[in-house]
Amino acid sequence: HVRALNLHTVGLGGDSEIKIEEQVLSVGPKRIAPVSWLGEKMDAHKAIDFLERHIDDYSSSSEPAQLFSATSFGNGSEAGHSDSELALTDQEHHIIDLLRERPYSLLELGWKMGMGHWMMVPVHKLEERHLLQRSGLTPTDLLHHRGQLDLWDAETAEHYIRLLSRRAKYGMEELTKRVFEIIEERVATELLRKQLVHGDDLSTKGKCGLCGEMVKNILCRGNESLTLSVRFHYPV
């Protein structure tokens, strides 16, 4: 017999995308580059300054505030493909030319290219071909803000977190606290699901209000009426 680990992945990590949609926070499963990493590579403050000046132009979603930069492929140093092989449109070439200068947000790209809405900016093919890199708010940036991590540029992370907190009408500490609560609840829920569901059938992923309240009770060590606890039969 071959010994193996019985694994179940959750899709949460330091590079998980943190999004704000209508003041509702979500974490993952998409992965993006942390803005602290971007700030270590190049100056992103002009892009964030633009977002601050146009803060009323993206009221319902944080996606247009995500930042884009040209990769080494997009800069041409390692492309290995001719323009004809890449078959980029004039608009896509324009995006790459802009990003070779400095990072831009999706909102500013739309404004710079004279498009009516940021959703019209054609970045998806460029992402798929690794010609540009998407950056945004991640748990790594929040750890830089807390002083618990010192890998990259904490100043850029602070600048960006302050912007998104203002846009979402959260305080910086409130936003940070809520994100880590979401991560904690997700990890705890998946740990319990893995132990409770036999075999590989983990398809019961619908939201359950009672289940969520039970997880919160366990993590918060109870409330005035009830205290729940969990004991695993082996290490996890």
PLM region descriptions:
Residues 1-236:
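N-terminally biased helix-coil "hinge/interface" segments that flank
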